[in-house]
């Protein structure tokens, strides 16, 4: 029972698909996601096109990183994979997670801004991962 309380404490009852803004018919991909990510999302079968790690023209990409060095390397590549009206979520381990490294919300935001995207939302993915939603600025969308 204590484990159940720990996992649900402080987390929204909304589904992760809703929190992340994944829409039916979207072309989506995940990079370095935890093994349990698909079950955490609770994706409705057949409503999304889930594509591989190198696909482009994505409506939604969720990048999981554990340290600053990896994020600095991965962010520009991830940005190129999304459509100009697409969404890039970047997740990093929470400070209380056993996975925690040298990332924080401010560091992730700083790297995103330096790469020309803006953050528009923050969300708890689960007890181990936080996330920031990045999009292209309105003037940069086609």
For each predicted feature, which ranges?
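Conserved beta-strand signature within the Rossmann-like core of class I S-adenosyl-L-methionine
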Residues: 84-94
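N-terminal and secondary-structure boundary signal
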Residues: 48, 78, 139-142
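Short acidic low-complexity segments
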Residues: 47-58
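Short, glycine-rich nucleotide/cofactor-binding loops
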Residues: 61-71
